[in-house]
Each structure stands twice: as C-alpha cells, then as structure tokens.
Amino acid sequence: GGDYSRIDEKAAAEMFDYAISHGVNYFDTAWGYHDGESENAVGRILSAYPRSSFHLASKFPGYDLSNMGKAEEIFEAQLKKCGVDHFDFYLFHNVCEMNIDAYLNEEKYGTYAYLMKQKAAGRIRHLGFSAHGSYQVVKRFLEKYGKDMEFCQLQINYVDWEFQSANKKVELLREWGIPVWVMEPLRGGKLASLSPDNEAKLRAMRP
C-alpha cells in the first residue's frame, strides 16, 4: 500500500552514501519508476557527488506504447531530471511481446536511430536493453539491433532459469558476444520470503 510516487529522500540519501562509501558506483533508474519521481530523486541525491565517481543508467520507456515516437522529448527530460549531461548506460526498457513490433518499427518511430545518434555524440556511453520477453522476442530484437547492443539485463534466478527460459536467452546472448547483467536474482524478494507458517517457526526459535 501507500503512495508509490513518494520517496523518503533522506533515507534514500543515507542509503546512497552508505553504498558509495562501501564501493558501489553503479546506480540504475528509469522513466517510470516511482510514478516518474525516481529520476528526480536520484538526480538530486547524486548531485552531492563528483560525476566521475559513479555510473548512471536509465532507460527508454517503450513498455508504454504511447511513448513511442517521443525518444528525443523523453531523453532530454531524463538528462534534466537526473541533472547530468550523459548517461553511462542507457537501455531499451523491457523488450517483450507487447512492444517488440514497435521497437523494431524504425520507419515509424526511429527510436534506435535517435539513441545511436546520442551515443555518437557521447550522451550515451553504452547502449543496451532489458528483456522480460520470450526467447523468440529477444532473438528478433538481436537480429535487428544486436550488432550495436553492448549489454543485456535479464531476470535471472533459480525459478526463471527455466520458467522464463533465461538459460536459453543467456546462451543466445553468448552467441552474440553480448554481456549479461542480472536483475531480480531474488525475484523482487519473493525468493527470499518464507511462508507465514515457516517464518513464524523461525521467529519462535529466535524472537
């Protein structure tokens, strides 16, 4: 419950500070996270640190088809929200069954061409994609854009290794020579949670 758009920036800033002081230097945000407020908060928090001290990633929100055709408008807004002049890593967000045709329709939307232009200008240092779609969807995306993709972010954990065919997608990406970045290793915490009965038993042993 609660308001997803509300971010406790004081607590978040403390977490960032702890992470940075312990060697973390990669931070990931996106257009839609926290109802559009994540990039604003991340930008404000990271403004306290030298730009060269961290790597920042964001994503083009193609999961919402109403954003197709708005790559320039969205990208410029993202840079402004994050308070930076470039993204170290930028992704086609959530390549899946719902949006693959739009992502591949360069003639109509030109998303890929625009992002490659920003990469050539140094405003995107590394271009990649994240995927929740099927093996066939990832294959179609790679057949069109794979030669220019520098990394892929996949949902990999012991459930999705076979349930979402992560194993086959990893092998496909290996064939393309594209590094794999792991997301959701605990499936949003679900794989770290016990059933209420089992949790109660453990808590009873050590209140």
Regions found by a protein language model. Name each.
Residues R6-A19, N67-C82, G133-L142:
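Short, acidic/polar
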Residues V24, V84-F87, I124, M149:
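A structural motif
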Residues I20-S21, G43-S53, E76-D85, F141-K147, ...:
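Acidic (Asp/Glu)-rich catalytic clusters
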Residues K80-A102:
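Active-site groove signature of glycoside hydrolases
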Residues A19, F27, V42, L56, ...:
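Conserved, mostly hydrophobic/aromatic
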Residues G1-K10, K59-G69, D101-Y103, E199-R206:
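Active-site mouth loops of central-metabolism enzymes
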Residues N94-P207:
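Beta/alpha (TIM)-barrel catalytic core signal, keyed to glycine-rich beta->alpha loops juxtaposed to Asp/Glu
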Residues G1-F54, Y114, A120:
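N-terminal binding-site loop/beta-alpha segment at the start of enzyme catalytic domains
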